[in-house]
Regions:
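Catalytic cores of secreted or luminal carbohydrate-active enzymes
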Residues: 266-316
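C-terminal beta-strand-rich structural cap/linker in extracellular carbohydrate-active enzymes
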Residues: 376-400
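Aromatic-lined carbohydrate-binding/catalytic grooves of carbohydrate-active enzymes
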Residues: 50, 54-154
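Sec-dependent N-terminal signal peptides
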Residues: 4-13
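Structural recognition of the beta-strand scaffold that forms the well-ordered cores
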Residues: 28-34, 63-70, 108-113, 143-148, ...
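Carbohydrate-binding surface patches
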Residues: 271-274, 279-281, 319-359
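Glycan-recognition surfaces
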Residues: 132, 176-282
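Boundary at the C-terminal end of the N-terminal hydrophobic targeting segment
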Residues: 16-20
């Protein structure tokens, strides 16, 4: 084959693979990740049991279709040829067998690695092995790669993540690429053509607004979104998100013991309001029915998964009234509105629709969590709300 023709065919092939990648994550990705609950305590049996549980409890059919094995799945060193090796005790049948099982159950298979020389838990990282590792992932049937940012030395974040993106393209298997760079190099400004989602902050843990070293409660992470980018409302960090590329405020802590039921519901509601990827982080094998019902609520998930792809924003914050109001533009002229009680005790919250200046016109109001009509926007709405709980509404244009 002559050289110009060969180069042309390579370019066509690369373009075709890139198009397959661009067709992923048109709505925020949904799934489950092992880290928040299990950390290093993972194995083949756990992953299979999790998949089976997500079928039985309705999570798979609700859209949670990625199952992601986080850090600590590897052996401590590569083999003599430089290949990654799954831990033979945790995964005695290798990772292709795990991927095959997940695919047979209707899931997609996700895995973790790191842009540095070692992962955050001190296993082999991807730096210098990107193309080799991408081929391994493809051979195992990997559909999702979470790529962390530990032990990166002086590496440039944008170029490092682009290298892994190019390696995934070259391997030929469409992989949803999740950049876990913690927002240190403002990935929202450059990552839309590199990956499908990017972390905006450090790690979450199961707390409302606590801080534990590197980890933060979900409300603290939510508040941080407003210090990352100059601007307010729709001009804040949400302007960088949309179909195929999403701001990622980290995984869900819904159902974990550090949160009350109300705090879990508020956490879930507000992640849906900001069009966040919804990666469950609890032990779904032993989930209480009320958390199952929360995480599979179709009306709430529809807010997160709305095809318009707009990220919601804080429209009103009144600490003296213990209220924050978040709004999210939806398809077909509809809106979602979420009112959070920031008080340490139950409070009466009043939503005055005329104060939400971006929502113009008259709307019918539906209370999403109670699945009941809640009047219209010509009259304010008042209800008693538990500490750190929410009111969640969907607004539909009033019929003339």
């Amino acid at each position: 084959m002559n050289k110009p023709l060969f180069l042309l065919l390579c370019a066509i092939s690369t373009t075709a693979f890139a198009q397959k990648f661009e067709g992923l994550a048109l709505t925020p990705p949904m799934g489950w990740n092992s880290w928040n609950t299990f950390a290093a305590n993972i194995n083949e049996a756990l992953i299979k049991e999790t998949a089976d549980a997500m079928i039985a409890n309705g999570m798979r059919d609700a859209g949670y279709n990625y199952i992601v094995i986080d850090d600590c799945w590897e052996s401590k060193e590569r083999d003599a040829k430089g290949n990654l090796v799954p831990d033979p005790v945790k995964f005695p049948n290798g990772l292709k067998a795990v991927g095959d099982y997940l695919h047979s159950k209707g899931f997609k298979f996700g895995i973790h690695s790191c842009a540095g020389t070692r992962t955050c838990a001190d296993f082999p990282g991807g730096r210098g092995h990107e193309y080799q590792d991408a081929l391994s992932y493809a051979s195992w049937g990997v559909d999702f790669l979470k790529y962390d940012w530990c032990n990166h030395g002086t590496a440039d974040a944008r170029e490092t993540y682009k290298t892994m993106r190019d390696a995934l393209h070259a391997a030929g298997r469409p992989v949803l690429f999740s950049l876990c760079e913690w927002g240190q190099n403002k990935p929202w400004e450059w990552a839309a053509d590199v990956g499908h989602m990017w972390r905006t902050t450090g790690d979450i843990y199961d707390s409302y607004d606590g801080r534990k070293g590197w980890e933060m409660g979900w409300k603290r992470i939510l508040d941080l979104q407003y210090s990352l980018v100059d601007g307010n409302g729709p001009d804040c960090i949400g302007k960088f998100a949309g179909p195929g590329h999403w701001n990622d405020p980290d995984m869900l802590e819904v159902g974990n013991e550090g949160l009350t039921f109300a705090e879990s519901r508020a956490h879930f509601s507000l992640w849906c309001m900001i069009a966040a990827p919804l990666m469950a982080g609890n032990d779904v094998r032993h989930m209480k029915p009320e958390y199952r019902d929360m995480m599979t609520n179709k009306a709430v998930l529809a807010i997160d998964q709305d095809a318009l792809g707009k990220q919601g924003y804080r429209a009103l914050a009144e600490p003296h009234n213990n209220i924050e109001i978040w709004v999210k533009e939806l398809s077909n002229g509809e809106w979602a509105v979420c009112a959070l009680n920031t008080s340490m005790k139950a409070e009466e919250l009043t939503v005055r629709w005329d104060r939400l200046w971006t929502i113009q016109g008259e709307f019918a109001v539906h209370n999403v969590w109670t699945n009941q009509p809640a009047g219209d926007t010509t009259k304010s709405y008042t209800a008693k709300v538990d500490s750190h709980d929410v009111l969640l509404f969907r607004l539909t244009p009033a019929k003339k």
